[in-house]
């Protein structure tokens, strides 16, 4: 696909967002106003700016990275506008900020290249650990920065700027830093990790000392789970690492080890933390616990059940009855109002992004770039699976965001930077 065709698809995605907002306004019996043009302009400005930056500083990058992300964002803006117009306005501001930060990243990588960022892997680890601990700061006090607990998990950082406050979720940046650290670490130790001199029954295992990084990252994930009480970030962090180590070695033994450690950590969390137990109950018995833990999931299923093939129509359903519909349950809201067709569009968008990401990783000859591309794709894919799977009751609810769709500035920034890294890697390792 040419860059011209890519730009046309981005404009079309902006049109989808504007059309969706138009339907929301008409469904509410309101008069057509400037919100439609503003939504279109913000989409064109954000994705157009990133598109031009890629043309300038990564011209050989894949042309199939931005369009699916633009489609997902377009559907999201329309649905968030339907659920909460104030949040929709804030999401548009965050979209512009995310695009600006991605342009800055592409400019930096144009001058330094991905080889330069490989040298600072331990700095990424240190920075990531500091960011993970920042939400543990006291919620009150004289400091302009403080932690904030939401829904039983301590994930948020609040920065007081005097005239306003900014809430940010450091974990969205930590996932990128951890991928960069692990890619640098595994690129150096790929051969040693691939060796399997010890055998236990039908399974072959590497030397115990080679398993140290697996256990260490599992321990870090447990710290996140215990201290921040965040099941989603813990599962995402460890799952992405297991995916990366499997990519580096091609040994399914690591998937087995990762599965055992994940199951044991999940069981421990279920027994130790009330809010994790509630999420398991919502997963297993949502309708039996309708008045309590299962209310959110049950309402989501009722809504999706009314969606049928084409949905009730955007602005005509009742996704507002689902708690946290704009964040945790945006997929259920879209499924109700756009039906199976809208759900399929979301799944197709993620499938395309994941396929492109792994395709970039497979083409890479450099180990670091290969593992970075694979790690970023594992993060994106696992995050989408955990939240959509939670809504569909394939896995317990984790409370993480759906990339490019859930309301939240930190999520949008983190995922746009992820796209920027993938674009740069695909430029350096063209098809």
What residue spans do the PLM features occupy?
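A juxtamembrane structural motif centered on a specific transmembrane helix
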Residues: 1, 387-431
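N-terminal membrane topogenic signal
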Residues: 1-15, 61, 209
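Juxtamembrane "helix-exit" motif on the non-cytosolic side of transmembrane helices
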Residues: 23-29, 80-83
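Hydrophobic alpha-helical transmembrane segments of multi-pass inner membrane proteins, especially
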Residues: 33-293, 332-390, 417-421
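Extracytosolic (periplasmic/ER-lumenal) interhelical loops and adjacent juxtamembrane/interface segments
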Residues: 159, 292-316
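Transmembrane helix boundary and interhelical junction motifs in multipass membrane proteins
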Residues: 230-235, 311-314, 325-327, 344, ...
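Long, low-complexity hydrophobic alpha-helices enriched in A/L/V/I and glycine
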Residues: 303, 309-310, 337, 407, ...
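Long extracytoplasmic/lumenal interhelical loops at the membrane interface
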Residues: 308-341, 361
